[in-house]
């Protein structure tokens, strides 16, 4: 499913359910006389009332995290400036949060903004992330907003065939541009990782090659770590 289509699907899911509750289209009875008013059925009225209050749950709960560059220093441990921002579990709560936070193009230089499955911290040391790795895409400065949104929609909408492998994603704002990284659990599972990388490129219509780096390699070799997989 294309990213734009996922966005429309999540936005109009409630409308489709309402249509189904109304018998699939709400056609006018052929025997009604001209000018006669069709009364709303009790079932439809009841469903409409529920749709106003009932939210649409996601497969998993997710948490936004912000790493504030103004509190970072070389003397503090990595991740000490991470702050839990908001946890959401429904489509409506996601949009409520997303529409009220800064998008990557508006974040300050050096900022990292994360979205991870609830109770997974965006750290290499987290038990769920420890044996994983990351796919990474690069963007020109101020050009990652749409790709960040579509990455979020693909994750929380459970669009990946190996969605259980995904821990979360982070967008990083730097002087030379922006990067989006997709974190996964089991780096050694090549089949799952390659599938995720290919689908991610497809969802974002991203044409450049992307590489996958093991967390273990990144910890040992830092910027000298090499891609283990490329798609």
Swiss-Prot record:
Effect in UniProt of substituting residue 77 to D: In allele pot-1
GO BP term, pick one: regulation of translation
Main location: nucleus
InterPro entries: TIF_eIF4e-like, TIF_eIF_4E
Top-level lineage group: Eukaryota
Entry binding sites for mRNA: 74-79, 106, 124-125, 174-179, 219-223
Protein task: Component of the protein complex eIF4F, which is involved in the recognition of the mRNA cap, ATP-dependent unwinding of 5'-terminal secondary structure and recruitment of mRNA to the ribosome. Recognizes and binds the 7-methylguanosine-containing mRNA cap during an early step in the initiation of protein synthesis and facilitates ribosome binding by inducing the unwinding of the mRNAs secondary structures. Key component of recessive resistance to potyviruses. (Microbial infection) Susceptibility host factor required for viral infection (e.g. potato virus Y (PVY), pepper mottle virus (PepMoV) and tobacco etch virus (TEV)) by recruiting viral RNAs to the host ribosomal complex via an interaction with viral genome-linked protein (VPg).
Sequence similarity: Belongs to the eukaryotic initiation factor 4E family.
Protein name stated in the entry: Eukaryotic translation initiation factor 4E-1
């Amino acid at each position: 499913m294309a990213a734009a289509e996922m966005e429309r699907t999540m936005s109009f899911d409630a409308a489709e359910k309402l249509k189904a509750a109304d018998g699939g289209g709400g056609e006018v009875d052929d025997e009604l006389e001209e000018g006669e008013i069709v009364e709303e059925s009790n079932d439809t009225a009841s469903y409409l009332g529920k749709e106003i209050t009932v939210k649409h749950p996601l497969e998993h709960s997710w948490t936004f995290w912000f790493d504030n560059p103004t509190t970072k220093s070389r003397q503090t441990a990595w991740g000490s400036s991470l702050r839990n921002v908001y946890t959401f579990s429904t489509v409506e709560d996601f949009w409520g949060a997303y529409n009220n936070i800064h998008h990557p193009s508006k974040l300050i230089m050096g900022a990292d903004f994360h979205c991870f499955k609830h109770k997974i911290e965006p750290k290499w040391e987290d038990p769920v992330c420890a044996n994983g790795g990351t796919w990474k895409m690069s963007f020109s400065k101020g050009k990652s907003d749409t790709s960040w949104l579509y990455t979020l929609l693909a994750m929380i909408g459970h669009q990946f065939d190996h969605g259980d492998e995904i821990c979360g994603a982070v967008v990083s704002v730097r002087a030379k541009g922006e990067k989006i990284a997709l974190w996964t659990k089991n780096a050694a599972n090549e089949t799952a990782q390659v599938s995720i990388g290919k689908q991610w490129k497809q969802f974002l219509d991203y044409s450049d090659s992307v590489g996958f780096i093991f967390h273990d390699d990144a910890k040992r070799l830092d910027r000298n770590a090499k891609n283990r997989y490329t798609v």
